[in-house]
Amino acid sequence: DFDLTYFPLKHLGYKCVVGTVGELYASLARPCSISVRLGISAKLDLPQISELWNGICSAASEHNITKADLDLIPSRNGLAISIVITGISSAKFSENRKSAQSKDLVCISGNVGAAFLGMSLLEREKRKFEKAGDVTGQPDLEKYRMLVGAYLKPELNPDIVGQFSDSSITPSYGYLVNRGLGDAVRRLHRDSGLGVKLYTDKIPFEGNSFEVGKILDIDPISAAMNGGDDFRLLYVIPLSQYETFRHDFQTFSIIGHIAKPDVGSVLVTPEGAE
């Protein structure tokens, strides 16, 4: 879902592609071709469609996608976007992938919760705008630029699969975090049959997340666990490769570990409460 009141069409096109390639990166596949279907209503004109397509092409180019197809179909109202991206995975990953073990590391590619806070800021400003009826004023969101940007134009490292290919590390599991960290952890628990422990003091946050959380009356930890659209990559890394991982993947944070099956999926506070 998206709200064109505050969502630039170019950013929307870009974000749709990033969200789709993220699923491929989670499984260590490289994207190679994209097929786009746009349902267009009479509410959108050619410049707007071009802006959306430019965003799609920008992201496709950034992620080294060399083939693109576009299909335009009529829509009774609004805008509908369908994107399919195909990718290729190296046999090396399948051959080297091992089952997860208790104490293996749960790692994430960047901060979480920022996108939900950014969206909440935009929704707040939209309500103010609608209440005031001021069509000339623009909200000042500069000091929240990182949070708003995390929602409107999330980014993923297009070289992540190459990094793993060059490394001796093969994750046992990988997920795109796009419906909250809690959702990804539940999927990991389900797929592995093992327990998962996350530690709240290890979860990375954007710098002013807690300040904004107070303003919006939103707990940033809850935003990280239950919010969406962060577009981060979560991998399970063998404990034996900790030193190599810390050296080769310095932008990642280790936020927890695999546990025994009877643990389930739990969040541990700094005081040790689960």
Predicted features by range, described:
Residues D1-E274:
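Helix-biased detector of long, well-ordered alpha-helical tracts
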